[in-house]
Amino acid sequence: MTTTLFSSRIIQSALDFDVYKVNMMSAVAALYPDAMVSYKFIVRSEEDLSELLPEVKAEVLKLQDVRFTEDEIAYMKRVAPYLKPEFVEALRHFRFNPQSDVSFHNKTMSDGSSQLRITINGLWKETILYETIIMSIVSEVRSRQRWSDIPFEQFQTVLEDKVRYLKAELERRNITNFKFADMSTRRRFSFQAQRTMLEYLSKELPQCLTGTSNYHLARELDLTPIGTVAHEWFMGHQALVNVRDSQKIALQRWQKMFNGALGIALTDTIGIDAFLKDFDEELSHAYVGVRHDSGCPFTWGEKMIAHYESLGIDPMTKTLVFTDGLNFEQALDICEHFQGRVQVSFGIGTSLANDMGNYVNDQGEAYQPLSIVIKMVTCNGSPVAKISDEPEKAMCEDIFFLMNLKRRFEQPLDLNECRKLIDRLESEGQNYLIDA
C-alpha cells in the first residue's frame, strides 16, 4: 500500500468520474441530443480559491488528451449492460473540448475579495461529464497547494478510527443490515486518498461496502460501480417540457430508458411533498427505491414509508438510499431507526475521502474540506432550479423562475427564504436574474 496522499496525476483516466454522469449522458444523447446547457461552479466555503486558477485551468485543459480506451469500453459493456451497446461503442469517439466548453475567471465579490469562477457551456451530451471531474481537480489542487504537509499517517489513522468505531457500534447495536457505498469522487482530498480508503475498507468491511461511485476505481479494485441519476436530469426537464409536468416526465422517461435497471428516484429537486404527488402508484411500483439528499432523513423516511403503505406496497420491498453529507455515526442512527421497516442503504463521500480529523498546520489553521458545487443553471437558454428540502441547498439564478416553479408545484412561497437566497447569491458574486 502506498504511503503518500498524492499520485502523479489528478485525473487518472476517462473513467475517473461518478457513475451517474455517464448514465445521464446516455439518456441525454438518446432523448435530447440537441439540448444546450450551462453549468456554474460555486464555492460555498469562506475560502478564497482565486490563486488556484492557473493550476486548475491547466489541469482541466489536460482533459483534451483523455480518451476512452478499448479496455475501458469493454469493461463498461460488461458491468453496465443497461447502457445501450451503440452508446458505449460511441464513447471511443468522445473528446473533451475544454478550450471551448469551459471558461475560468476570478470574480471580485461585494466585499472586495476575489473568488474562483468556472462556467461550462455547450451541448448537454458533450458537457455532462465535466462536473465531477472538475470538482475533483479543484479539490486536489487546493490540497496540493495548501495542505501538502498533511502526513499520510494522519489520514490513515482517522480512517482506522472510523472503522473501529463502526465495527464496535454494529456489534453493540446488533445492526446486521448496514450497507454503504463510497461516493467521494467529487470532494475527495485527492485521488490517492480515495484509492487508499477504498483499498482499506474493501479489506476491513467487505460485508458493508457495496461499491463505489467511481468507475475508474471500481475497475481497478474489482468493486461494484454504484450510481443512478442526479438533480440535473430533473432540472433540465424544467426547460424541455411543461414545467409542472417536468418531474413526472423525467421519472417516466428515465424508467423507460433503462427498463427499470436504474430504479432509484431522487426526491428533492422540487421537494419531497411535490415529489410524492408525482410519484404515483405506477411509478412507486416501478422504481425499486428512492434517494434522500436533503432535509431531515427521519421525517423524509417516515413520509416514504407512509406513501408506500397508502398504496398497498410493503415498504420492506423498497429501498431508501441516504446520501446527504453523512458520516458513519449519522448513518447508523438512520439505519437503527428504520431497521425492520424498510430496506436502507447509504452513500458516504467527504467523511470517507476528505477527513483529516483534528489536523492543524504550523500556522494554526485547522483543516476543513471544501464545500463546492457545480450545478446546471440553464437549459436551452431558460433558467432551471433545484428547490431542495434544505433551503441552503437551493440553486437558481432567476428568482422569478424560482417563484413561478414553487407556485406551479404548489410549494409555499416564503419571502424571507427568497430574500436569503438573493443575499446568498449576492455574497457569492452571482446574478439572481437571468431573464425577466
From Swiss-Prot:
InterPro entries reported for this sequence: N/Namide_PRibTrfase (IPR041525), NAPRTase_N (IPR040727), Nic_PRibTrfase (IPR006406), Nic_PRibTrfase-Fam (IPR007229), Nicotinate_pribotase-like_C (IPR036068)
Enzyme Commission code: 6.3.4.21
Keyword Phosphoprotein: yes
GO CC entries: cytosol
Alphabetized UniProt keyword annotations: Ligase, Phosphoprotein, Pyridine nucleotide biosynthesis
One MF term in the entry's GO annotations: nicotinate phosphoribosyltransferase activity
Domain of life from the UniProt record: Bacteria
Pathway listed: Cofactor biosynthesis; NAD(+) biosynthesis; nicotinate D-ribonucleotide from nicotinate: step 1/1
Pfam families: NAPRTase (PF04095), NAPRTase_N (PF17767)
PANTHER family found in the cross-reference section: NICOTINATE PHOSPHORIBOSYLTRANSFERASE
Function of the molecule: Catalyzes the synthesis of beta-nicotinate D-ribonucleotide from nicotinate and 5-phospho-D-ribose 1-phosphate at the expense of ATP.
Stored NCBIfam families: NAPRTase (TIGR01514), PRK05321.1 (NF003704)
Name recorded for this polypeptide: Nicotinate phosphoribosyltransferase
Organism: Vibrio parahaemolyticus serotype O3:K6 (strain RIMD 2210633)
Gene name linked to the record: pncB
